[in-house]
């Protein structure tokens, strides 16, 4: 009986995928934040003139369009930014 109960709990957790959340780097990549519901992309923003220096990183729901001055790079896996 205990085995059956344990099996049901494990199957429920696997099927519902409880607790899956995306993790995105903050400005300093050593630190990250767990994204709230609905924000399913990580992003990195930097100035086009200085592409090696990110200005901002975090979670976002829709990837913004880049402009002549600012470029956005978006991705959807943990700590990919």
UniProtKB/Swiss-Prot annotation:
Tissue expression pattern: Expressed by the venom gland.
Disulfide-linked positions: 24-42, 35-59, 63-74, 75-80
CDD domains documented for this protein: TFP_snake_toxin
Ranges annotated as spanning the membrane: none
Coiled coil: none
Primary residence: secreted
Presence of keyword Secreted: yes
Gene3D superfamilies on file: CD59
UniProt-listed InterPro entries: Cytotoxin_Cobra (IPR003572), Snake_3FTx (IPR003571), Snake_toxin-like_sf (IPR045860), Snake_toxin_con_site (IPR018354), Toxin_cobra-type (IPR054131)
GO (cellular component) term, any one: extracellular region
Localisation: Secreted; Target cell membrane
Keyword field contains DNA-binding: no
GO biological process: killing of cells of another organism
Keyword annotations of the record: Cardiotoxin, Cytolysis, Disulfide bond, Membrane, Secreted, Signal, Target cell membrane, Target membrane, Toxin
Signal peptide extent: 1-21
GO molecular function, one term: toxin activity
Entries under Pfam families matching the protein: Toxin_cobra-type (PF21947)
Function according to Swiss-Prot or TrEMBL: Shows cytolytic activity on many different cells by forming pore in lipid membranes. In vivo, increases heart rate or kills the animal by cardiac arrest. In addition, it binds to heparin with high affinity, interacts with Kv channel-interacting protein 1 (KCNIP1) in a calcium-independent manner, and binds to integrin alpha-V/beta-3 (ITGAV/ITGB3) with moderate affinity.
This protein's name: Cytotoxin 4a
Native organism: Naja sputatrix (Malayan spitting cobra)
The organism's taxonomic lineage, starting at the top: Eukaryota, Metazoa, Chordata, Craniata, Vertebrata
